[in-house]
């Protein structure tokens, strides 16, 4: 027992009232659920450490994604976002945990739940929300919308189920060709795990030992179909056959971080691809047009929110371990709320690209050329090469 603790004990024994003192921790160890392994002799550590700085950052990052997605859901209901919109609420620990393990030069490619990843890899909250509403301030000036955002080393959302799987292998091939010590994190859902291109991509990746992590974010439902009804084998981490795999608790950010670190080291050592399955859950329907309650009950969703929510669980951990106080986390919540609210103002008021921008951003570094129009007889001369050129022409660089 420390001298400080003995003194407190002595004072209490003497009948003197003492006030509880909580000393802030700087680093704490936690235990995570063991990973399930496929064709591997060992896996990630179950004893992990977390320092105060990282704890506050991870909490803030997950809260930004949660609040940003909530804002997007409201914008869709107000018909300020049109078309498709798939939300990531409930799965925040997957993205933030993986990002925490990535290093400079690592790449990510995913499907249509891409808003959080776009922000994590460099876009601002304003750029994400403004892209969703089709505004100039958007990540790609409003041209991409919900499913087609990108930033440096983020190869986007992809609107076709499973289309990103072979593309991720291609990014990894480029990394190996350039002799980069990096990996491409290729994400897909349990619904896309049955797509033929995944098996083609894993075959080529293993054949050439490409540094690619094939990550299945198993949220239990492919649209409205349960994994058990769509897959003969629901152990997605084993589906690579000759590609080793690990199963991870995707609701635990620390388990995700440690597993991704381990997986990245595996790929960096030249052993080739690895499959990861993140067991997670989405709170909303498949998309905003799906209420998400025809194939599951509201009670099921509430039970997950109550017992497995990634943000609440992490919050409880860092408070009870004295890495942060409840007041500090409330201050972060307030700061995040303000950031998202400010972004919403721009996302709902900024202008849109003029019609001339429709034909920009088609070809890279080429002179103006004729582009086929809506009919075979219609041709249009490309007046601007990029949207930036269009904005410059109207005085908005």
Swiss-Prot record:
Principal place of residence: mitochondrion
Biological process annotations from GO: pyruvate decarboxylation to acetyl-CoA
InterPro entries according to UniProt: DH_E1 (IPR001017), PDH_E1_Alpha_Subunit (IPR050642), Pyrv_DH_E1_asu_subgrp-y (IPR017597), THDP-binding (IPR029061)
Gene name tied to this protein: pdha-1
Cofactor: thiamine diphosphate; Mg(2+)
Keywords assigned by UniProt, alphabetized: Magnesium, Metal-binding, Mitochondrion, Oxidoreductase, Phosphoprotein, Pyruvate, Thiamine pyrophosphate, Transit peptide
Official protein name in the record: Probable pyruvate dehydrogenase E1 component subunit alpha, mitochondrial
Subcellular location: Mitochondrion matrix
Record text on activity regulation: E1 activity is regulated by phosphorylation (inactivation) and dephosphorylation (activation) of the alpha subunit.
Domain of life: Eukaryota
A cellular-component GO term for this protein: mitochondrial matrix
Function, in words: The pyruvate dehydrogenase complex catalyzes the overall conversion of pyruvate to acetyl-CoA and CO(2). It contains multiple copies of three enzymatic components: pyruvate dehydrogenase (E1), dihydrolipoamide acetyltransferase (E2) and lipoamide dehydrogenase (E3).
Binding site for thiamine diphosphate: 112-113, 159, 161, 190-192, 219, 286
EC numbers for this chain: 1.2.4.1
Subunit structure: Tetramer of 2 alpha and 2 beta subunits.
Catalytic reaction equation(s): N(6)-[(R)-lipoyl]-L-lysyl-[protein] + pyruvate + H(+) = N(6)-[(R)-S(8)-acetyldihydrolipoyl]-L-lysyl-[protein] + CO2
One Pfam family per UniProt: E1_dh
Binding residues for pyruvate: 86, 112-113, 159, 161, 190-192, 219
GO terms assigned for molecular function: metal ion binding; pyruvate dehydrogenase (acetyl-transferring) activity
Residues that hold Mg(2+) according to the record: 190, 219
């Amino acid at each position: 027992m420390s001298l400080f603790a003995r003194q407190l004990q002595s004072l209490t024994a003497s009948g003197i009232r003492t006030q509880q003192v909580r000393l802030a921790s700087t680093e704490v160890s936690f235990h995570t659920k063991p990973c399930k392994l496929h064709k591997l002799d060992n896996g990630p550590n179950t004893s992990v450490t977390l320092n105060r700085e990282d704890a506050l950052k991870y909490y803030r990052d997950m809260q930004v994604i949660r609040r940003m997605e909530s804002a997007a859901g409201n914008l869709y209901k107000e018909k300020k976002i049109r078309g498709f919109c798939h939300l990531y609420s409930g799965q925040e620990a997957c993205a933030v945990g993986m990002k925490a393990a990535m290093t400079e030069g690592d790449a990510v490619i995913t499907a249509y739940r891409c808003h959080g990843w776009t922000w994590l890899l460099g876009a601002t909250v304003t750029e994400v929300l403004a892209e969703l509403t089709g505004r100039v301030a958007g990540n790609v000036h409003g041209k991409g919308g919900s499913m087609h955002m990108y930033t440096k080393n983020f190869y986007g959302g992809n609107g076709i189920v499973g289309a990103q799987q072979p593309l991720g292998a291609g990014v990894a091939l480029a990394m190996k060709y350039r002799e980069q010590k990096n990996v491409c994190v290729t994400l897909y859902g349990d619904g896309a795990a049955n797509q033929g291109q995944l098996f083609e991509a894993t075959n080529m990746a293993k054949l050439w030992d490409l540094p690619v992590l094939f990550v299945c974010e198993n949220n239990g439902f492919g649209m409205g179909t349960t994994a058990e009804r769509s897959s003969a084998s629901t152990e997605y981490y084993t589906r690579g056959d000759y590609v080793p795999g690990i199963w991870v608790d995707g609701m635990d950010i620390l388990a995700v971080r440690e597993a991704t670190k381990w997986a990245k080291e595996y790929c960096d050592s030249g052993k080739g691809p690895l499959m990861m399955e993140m067991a997670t859950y989405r709170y909303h329907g498949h998309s905003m047009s799906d209420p998400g309650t025809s194939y599951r009950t509201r009670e099921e969703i509430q039970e997950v929110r109550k017992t497995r929510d990634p943000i609440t669980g992490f919050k409880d951990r860092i408070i009870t371990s004295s890495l942060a106080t409840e007041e500090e986390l409330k201050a972060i919540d307030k700061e995040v709320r303000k950031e998202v609210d400010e972004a919403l103002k721009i996302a709902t008021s900024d202008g849109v690209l003029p019609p001339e921008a429709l034909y920009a951003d088609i070809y890279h570094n080429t002179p103006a050329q004729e582009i086929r129009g809506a009919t075979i007889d219609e041709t249009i001369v490309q007046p601007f090469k990029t949207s930036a050129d269009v904005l410059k022409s109207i005085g908005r660089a």
